[in-house]
Amino acid sequence: CVVPCSFSKNEIDESINNNNIEYLPAASEAIACSIAAGLKMSGKKPIVIIQSSGLSNMVSCITSLLKPYGVTFPILVSWRTYSEGDSEIQHKHLSKELPNLISSLGYQKEILDSSDLINSINQINSCNEKYKICIIEKNTFDKVELYNDRIKKTNSKISRVRYLSSLNDLYKNKDILFIGTTGHTSREMFKFMPNTNNFYMAGNMGGALSIGFGAAKSGRNVIVCGGDAEFVMHMGGLTTVGRDADEINLTYILFDNGQNKSTGGQDTYQDHLNYIGIAENAGFQVFRKPIDSI
């Protein structure tokens, strides 16, 4: 049960390649945790892989599901680092405080052995019967390439960079607040939208739309640039915003590339979703067809 991270790319890609493993991508860490709990209580052997910044999304599941019901399974958490001046500011706090957060949940913690495969397997297996989290440091695993038939084939008719550049030209120096979701979208906005008023949401995945809603409720004209994986992480925000959609000036642009691009390009497995229908049912006025030209 996985929410991708670039530090965990190699073990995630190996689980996708391996036919003996069922790879279950989850919309959020809380969902991954709940799925794993259901699997464990049904006699299966789940493993959860997440990144450190997502552990907080699991806290309620840990304290109100796993601990009171005595459910244990391996949880692998990649330890994202931070150095002063890095753009990934969302990792600053837990780059130091991750061990303390784990301890506060009543879990043991252990850094996964990167030099001894057998020992690392034993470390993971020990989590099956105790409250214990294994921490994955950067470059713990050897490089793994996804098999060609496991790589998401994209069919984008227009590049996000080109679209963002056009937004910059259209809204140059206008009183409109742009909010970019975490990952490549915000990075590309920083580079290709220099003349607009932008807020770059480096972390807090799934929260860009809700931030935009708060700004729009205060009277601002807001355009949110979101992504397909971000769309589902906290989809309740969509229904909350949709309730007041007719009373605010907010536009939500969803870039659907079918991938978690910034964490290694893993498939989001969301081809079954009708984003337009979901947004419309939540209360949004929508374009009936995806935008494929400028």
Question: For the regions a protein language model found, what residue spans apply to each?
Answer:
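Thiamine diphosphate
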Residues: C1-F213, K217-R220, Y269, L273-F284, ...
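A short alpha/beta connector and helix-capping loop motif
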Residues: K44, T63, F73, M233-D256
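DG-centered beta-turn motif at the end of beta-strands
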Residues: I47-S53, R220-V241
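Long, charge-dense
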Residues: E84-D86, G258-G265
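Active-site flanking residues adjacent to catalytic metal/cofactor-binding acidic residues
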Residues: I136, C225-A229, F255
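Short, function-defining helix-loop hinge/capping sites that tune catalysis or transport
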Residues: E145, G236-L238, G264
